[in-house]
Swiss-Prot record:
It comes from the Bacteria. The keyword Transferase applies. Optimum pH is 7.8-8.5. O-methyltransferase that catalyzes the conversion of demethylmacrocin to macrocin, the penultimate step of tylosin antibiotic biosynthesis. Also able to mediate the conversion of demethyllactenocin to lactenocin. The lineage of its organism: Bacteria, Bacillati, Actinomycetota, Actinomycetes, Kitasatosporales. The gene is tylE. It catalyses: demethylmacrocin + S-adenosyl-L-methionine = macrocin + S-adenosyl-L-homocysteine + H(+). This is Demethylmacrocin O-methyltransferase. It comes from Streptomyces fradiae (Streptomyces roseoflavus).
């Protein structure tokens, strides 16, 4: 119940951050500064990059809402992620960063905006009686640690290439080179309250591996809710804005139930088993639950050629593979141009696939209303007849 309440609060904060400042203040009045600040600190910790300061320090976040001041200290040191400092942590506070609560809400969860100044206050060595005595030991660490924490306080678009390395997901730099394509097709969704489903959380049967790409999408879509589906229990990957579900991507009933609970989705990414039958089942079950204007993505098309995944090394025998599915969508796009006596009855994909972008091992399928209309029947289908009809009778 507490987890559900927290998830609801996160969604409310995201919604308010995209509205007027008054919406944020009403939310804070309802839930209290402490509860809202807890959500914000959790987000900052998850977004902050790996610290580089070799001298451990504390950075104090002081979040103000009217007369209330909520201080939270973060421990920052090379070799470990940024974390909340324990109550008895007596480390050196190198910097105090003060935000207005409604301003920090909008910085973290509102539509991305560029503001070079005027968003926060800072105090170097806030509790030291004399700063000069600490310069040699803590000055550089203060600068580095503050930069790390402030990097977690922004919604500026991150570098997907860097995120793949940070979160240990092979979407760029090793097996694949997907991130430039993802950046191109996903950037327009960054400021929206998206719901992203990724099939396949990673780590196979290891109980503590996987979840890197979910964290990457959480960081990239700073206003989004991220869902991961896997045949194995990957609940260790759950955190604020990330939900994992145990299920079989080859079970249409499971997928329909998942979509009914968490959809409709703005984006679905199939990075699951890569077994061709599973890819096709997932598409047919989930594409109807992608909202108009959304995207369905299929990774690792190479398995279409591998018999061990249900593929076929002969490209001419690809009908039952993932690539066979992608190729069929070209006909779906053009279905209104087929002769009326073709005997083809338009299916769901025919009516709703409006764009197709295929790269090496990666396909993006755009969802919409595919009913622009075909070339009218009174237009001649024969070249010579078309020329004659279009020439006004001129010989």
């Amino acid at each position: 119940m507490a987890v559900q309440k927290e998830a609801t609060l996160v969604r409310q904060i995201i919604r308010a951050a995209g509205g007027h400042a008054a919406d944020v203040r009403e939310l804070v009045a309802e839930h209290g500064p402490e509860a809202v600040t807890a959500v914000l600190v959790d987000e900052i910790v998850s977004r902050a990059p790996h610290p580089v300061n070799d001298v451990p320090v504390l950075v104090e976040l002081a979040v103000r809402s009217g007369d209330a001041l909520v201080p939270r200290r973060l421990a920052v040191a090379q070799g470990a992620p940024v974390r909340r400092a324990a109550p008895d942590d007596d480390g050196f506070v190198a910097m105090r960063v003060e935000y207005e609560l409604d301003e920090l809400v909008r910085e973290l969860f509102g539509p991305c905006r560029e503001r070079a100044a005027g968003t926060r206050g800072t105090t170097l060595f806030p509790y030291a009686t004399s700063g000069t005595g600490h310069i040699d030991t803590y000055f550089l660490a203060a600068q580095q640690a503050t930069a790390t924490v402030l990097a977690g306080c922004t919604s500026a678009k991150p570098d997907l290439n860097e995120l793949t390395s940070r979160y240990l997901t092979p979407k760029w730099g090793s097996l694949h080179w997907f991130t430039p394509h993802y950046d191109r097709h996903f950037r327009e969704y960054r400021n929206e309250e998206v719901r992203v489903l990724e099939i396949g959380i990673g780590g196979y049967q290891h109980p503590e591996w996987g979840g890197g790409s979910l964290r990457m999408w959480k960081h990239f879509f700073h206003r989004g809710l991220i869902y991961g589906l896997d045949i194995e229990d990957k609940s260790h990957a759950e955190e604020q804005r990330i939900t994992t579900v145990v299920g079989d991507q080859n079970d249409p009933g499971c997928l329909t139930e998942l979509a009914a609970r968490y959809g409709p989705f703005d984006i679905v990414i199939d990075d699951g088993s890569h077994i061709n039958e599973h890819v096709r089942t997932s598409f047919h079950a989930l594409f109807p639950h992608v909202r108009p204007g959304g995207l369905y993505v299929i990774e690792d098309l190479w398995t279409a050629y591998w018999p061990g995944f249900g593929g076929d090394s002969d490209p001419g025998k690809s009908d039952l593979t993932s690539l066979g599915l992608v190729k069929s969508l070209v006909d779906s796009l053009q279905h209104q141009e087929l002769p009326e006596d073709s005997g083809r009855s338009p299916g769901y994909a025919d009516r709703h696939v409006v764009g197709l972008h295929v790269y090496h091992n990666l396909a993006f399928i755009e969802k919409g209303v595919n009913s622009e209309g075909g070339i009218p029947g009174w237009i001649p289908r024969d070249f010579d007849a078309l020329v004659a009809a279009s020439s006004g009778g001129a010989a």
